[in-house]
Amino acid sequence: MEFDTIAAISTALGEGAIGIVRLSGDEAVQLADRVYRGKKPLQEVPSHTIVYGHIVDPKTDEIIDEVMVSVLRAPRTFTREDVIEINCHGGLVSVNRVLQLVLNHGARLAEPGEFTKRAFLNGRIDLSQAEGVIDLIRAKTDRAMNVALKQVEGRLSTKISSLRQALLETVAHVEVNIDYPEYDAETMTLDMLKDRAQFVRKEIDKLLMTAQQGKILREGLSTVIIGRPNVGKSSLLNSLVHENKAIVTDIPGTTRDVIEEYVNVRGVPLRLVDTAGIRETEDIVERIGVERSREVLKEAELILLVLNFGEELSKEDEALFEAISGMEAIVIVNKTDVEQKIDLTRVRELAAGRPVITTSIVQDQGIDELEAAIASLFFESGIESGDVTYVSNSRHIALLEQAKRAVEDALEAIEMDVPIDMVQIDITRAWELLGEIIGDSVHESLIDQLFSQFCLGK
């Protein structure tokens, strides 16, 4: 497949030691040679070699920058095209001047994700691996990065391909049965079809069992801190983040809006939201914050309900318990450094079996227990780091669920003695749906949409 030559800055913009301008395409080496000056032309440099030289404007002979240039020839590159990486001095000016010179001499500015898109279109990676690259870039914890890295390496692709192969072999047997009915192989084929379908359904179930944990690792666990004003919600946020992100005072209603922060809790990424204290108020600004808090609460996957150890349970506290009925929650009784007035027995009754943790945030007590409770609530046996293949992408999860339904339709048809060619339709449908995960059968508009999520230069 032939493409034009593209270029982009592949390092983060801003001050730094090194900035890299990446080129990819059939003319990448020749184009770079137009602006490079070194001991010998880049076209004479062996593949996978880095050389020293200068980037020079050929029109004026002005030296733009002192550089190291990596020469990487197809097909042993990420895009399976010729690739040039110009290592410039970091900073906005030097890297942009080199990029502009390259663009002026024939390269096209790459679209977001276009390097990875070419790797996909040229068969270097499949679609699930490409999506793993996005997850790797966006990973918020080491565990999330490890899950993404396994996807980039093809762990999920291998699993999906093996399931598709099992279905394909089954379809092939069915077609032989249909084309050569004189061999009377229908009973054998139906038995085989049932066994294969049950095997594929079981393997899909195994993948879907990792979906909740995988999605949390990929997207973060939507966690909302709620409670009456001045019970220590903002102090809790600051303690978990290990920074002063929220204003902490003794004045009720200090937090008037929703504050959101990513937090790494024992390998679990939390999208932690500190809400305005939920109470009736005449303050217009605070009232808006309270309404936003109620909206955020509806979408939360985990609630951290904070109570005051030094105050009796109020009607507002009991109303909050009612508001989170049936939701995953941890109850935090804060301010154990003051005299106890709260009825902990009643708190545990209202918690209805959910964890109750006592803390004194000002004395840094109870935070370890809280973090352990959060991690165990969603990763009861810990976060697997071995051979587990996590499914973390919403698109993959939806396709696996659809493929499972198609397989179940086939099994139901077999039990009802439906003609074998009708059963084949469901099996083929499952095969196609699994193919969409790795990009074997997917619409071009979806491909464009997926790669548009990438940053420039990747």
UniProtKB/Swiss-Prot annotation:
Cofactor: K(+)
UniProt GO BP: tRNA methylation; tRNA wobble uridine modification
Annotated positions binding GTP: 230-235, 249-255, 274-277
Alphabetical list of SUPFAM superfamilies matching this protein: P-loop containing nucleoside triphosphate hydrolases, TrmE connector domain
Domain TrmE-type G, first and last residues per copy: 220-379
Binding site for (6S)-5-formyl-5,6,7,8-tetrahydrofolate: R22, E85, R124, K458
tRNA processing in keyword set: yes
Cofactor note: Binds 1 potassium ion per subunit.
GO MF, any single term: GTP binding
Subunit and interaction comment: Homodimer. Heterotetramer of two MnmE and two MnmG subunits.
NCBIfam families assigned: mnmE_trmE_thdF, PRK05291.1-3, small_GTP
Name of this protein: tRNA modification GTPase MnmE
Lineage: Bacteria, Bacillati, Bacillota, Bacilli, Bacillales
Gene name of the encoded protein: mnmE
